């Protein structure tokens, strides 16, 4: 009987499977083998699903390519994914990116994500922690309609995630301060001379240095 190697020689066979599997060992270097738990998802973006930790990581630079929820590159693992990390260089994700990830509990969005889609978390009843590191991320109406009770939002003081949490009665946990609100103290400039004033964060009291006023 013929093996996969014989088929490959005749039909240029490509094999997809799990890394470290018997199938990968069989293919060796003779037959092209591609893991089903990682790959490209845009011109400069990639995804990887860790089978041991049930964690999906999306990395790279720029937007992820558009796709429907049921054909997302990681759709094979929708029922298994427990946590998602979108790294800072990624700037956009398609509609319904994590819809139907029914066991998803934690998501971290990098600083490049400034707009969320209303269907990202459709049918994600177990989502309990969402970390948003961008300062002005847009939250669509009903973005958490498919999420159960007990959602906690993590983010920085004086950002859109803090405002959203307060407006919707959600628990907010601060990650720190971006020093977006500050006060200046010291002499005021005059008609004939400028002034050097000290700048302090109004939220956390951090010393932000000095500012020269003409």
Where in this protein do the model-derived segments appear?
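Short, aromatic/basic amphipathic alpha-helical patches
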Residues: 22-32, 143, 160-169
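Short, intrinsically disordered, charge-balanced linker/junction segments flanking boundaries
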Residues: 1-5, 26, 211-214
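Short, exposed beta-strand/loop patches in secreted or surface proteins that constitute
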Residues: 44-51
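Low-complexity, Pro/Thr/Ser/Gly/Ala-rich linker/spacer regions in secreted
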Residues: 30-44, 171-181, 212-214
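Structural signature of tandem-repeat unit edges
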Residues: 1-5, 10-21, 34-37, 53-62, ...
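Extracellular modular ligand-binding repeats in secreted and cell-surface proteins
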Residues: 87, 133, 176-214
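Acidic/polar low-complexity surface segments
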Residues: 65-77
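Consensus positions within tandem repeat domains that build extended binding/scaffold surfaces
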Residues: 94-97, 117-120, 143
